[in-house]
Swiss-Prot record:
Organism: Oryza sativa subsp. japonica
Predominant location category: plastid
Protein family membership: Belongs to the glycosyl hydrolase 13 family.
Chloroplast found in the keyword field: yes
Tagged with keyword Chloroplast: yes
Signal peptide from the UniProt entry: none
Identification of the protein by name: Isoamylase 3, chloroplastic
Name of the gene: ISA3
Amino acid sequence: MDSIGINRAPLGSSSSAAAVTARRGIALRPARRSVASTNRVGVATIGFGDASGLRACSEKVRRFDSVRSTTARAQNGNAGRSMTEERGCTMSDTEMPFKYSSGKAFPLGVSQVEGGLNFALFSQHASSVILCLKLPGRGTEDEKGADVVEFVLDQQKNKTGDIWHVIVEGLPASGVLYGYRVGGPQGWDQGHRFDSSTVLLDPYAKLVSGRKYFGVAEEKSSQHFGTYDFDSSPFDWGDDYRLPNLPEADLVIYEMNVRAFTADESSGLDSTSRGSYLGLIDKIPHLLELGVNAVELLPVFEYDELEFKRYPNPRDHMVNTWGYSTINFFAPMSRYASAGGGPVAASKELKQMVKELHKAGIEVILDVVYNHTNEADDAHPYMTSFRGIDNKVYYMLDLNKNAELLNFSGCGNTLNCNHPVVKELILDSLRHWVEEYHIDGFRFDLASVLCRGPDGCPLDAPPLIKEIAKDAVLSRCKIIAEPWDCGGLYLVGRFPNWDRWAEWNGKYRDDLRRFIKGDPGMKGVFATRVSGSADLYQVNERKPYHGVNFVIAHDGFTLCDLVSYNLKHNDANGEGGCDGCNDNFSWNCGVEGETNDLNVLSLRSRQMKNFHVALMISQGTPMMLMGDEYGHTRYGNNNSYGHDTCINNFQWEQLEQRRDGHFRFFSEMIKFRHSNPILRRDRFLNKNDVTWHEDCWENQESKFLAFTVHDHNSGGDIYLAFNAHDYFVDAVIPPPPHHKCWNRVVDTNLESPNDIVPEGVPFTGPKYRIAPYSSILLKAKP
């Protein structure tokens, strides 16, 4: 083992960074192309980078003053200890002895090995890599000093292929923060963005330390650093190896935001657990009462909620609460820990949340964002990790336009997903979440990006998509694609699937909205959508459940707003009304926005119920949005990603106010689906499975559809009728099956509790008078 000198480095010191740069022969990029660095503003955690920007942050966050330094380095393979003195500082050889060896290339990230910790980082184009370690502080939380160590890696001894690596002995088993300075070519037009003065986050860091409290503006400039915890005992999963493993056809998915679910004071939780993983555990009884059996969590990877505060702009008042601004693909969002607990607590509490959901029979699906990162675009560049480690590998570039970032994500950059190294990172990330956190499935944001090659062109057989489908660790996971991107690659019904991939059915959303609000010419496509969208999925030899049916998702209007607004109202977003979709297929029922008109409110209530009935009787996998069970409003904002307020937060007092009406209807309708297998077949309907009570399909003005779904086992047929006309329709009811009679279960025109009666109300008439904008459901019973 070689021993090295230890230097106390003011990692907030520009002179130190410059000295390292000079020693390694690296020329800094011209200032005109300077990448915004988190090091050059106030630092909340360590203070790597330029000391000129250091300032005091929140009292609750540790501050680190500049301390004198020298830089630890290996010297031409000498076994002795060397110390390079800077700024007149010397240290004794015994003050903080560390030893190092060359290390190994795999696994990437930090790992325990015999005798120490191995650090491994990929960078194909780097010419220098420096490992930066911030050791646990001594004394109290408010201690100003910090012990910092840097290791300059040797290209001969500490590099295998494109992997830089080193083993360090004597480090604590937890509490160390680490990052890398990476230097390399300065050819911007060749795709390089190296800046060795910036300390970068390890892409394979399993835990990330950043600001302590969610959305605290005083901490906006804090950096994010990798950390690890080899001290804690393995998490006790108990019997959680028995995952729910629900059939896809049986799922009812509830899309939700961990923070927004309990952040509001009306949740009744104390301030330490509101908006946290533990807070969600407290509300599992609500999920069970509603009847959902899978939660789809908006991103819980570490993300930057204060990305809008990097520079003055019209959005700098906003806080990203949706989480589509990924910093790291392996670490859980640390600020979802209770009481500002940090990354280690976040990991443990997320596991506890998953364990408790599984105990309740609820699967956990993660919304994952592998299409872009938080590092923005070239106009407002920001360097956290990938850009400075190897921009040319990690991002799609237009090499015909000075290596500008391609933007198929709508967020400024696009991850180069099918590059072999990036592909493996994504697969490693997915396996990590399954193995370490027992996750049941994944929904892939803007998944069409994952179907593009390094030049941005669509691939017929994307390697990443295939390998996810065929991976042995992921073989039991639900994998769901959002089959479009912001570059126009719309793959609904055409997403490469290898018999595994399900899709968000965007056509279902649009066609149901148009029929229910009364658009002409929509009856036929409405019938196709509720019967499983065979036109999209049967042709590819898939199953009905491969189509995830939804009317509402986090993007766009809530269900209440869909029936309350004709236009989006996004002024609060600071984008001049240019954000959010303009084609919402919504109808305000006669008045734009809030109203006290009882007739309008009654019509809106019927329409929300109509949408929910259609969703729950459709073949395929239904998904609903958090808050729609009580009629949550965002006041017409159809792109509310940046509001850490009641606009997004679940309003528990409103749930209580509407529990006996709106909520009861939604809950009972979900339970009706669970109790009737003919509504969730694993094959497409044939002519013996359904009877369409219709003889004028070509009539474009017809807005009425009635049909019977047959139960070949017990004769429990279900009759459904949807009237999207603005007048009454007298529907002729077909005879019930032999020895059965019809029972009315649903009439959305009736007031609660008669709008849904689970046990049914006997109906004997030959006709049923169906009110305008209403739907009915009859069940055949003995």
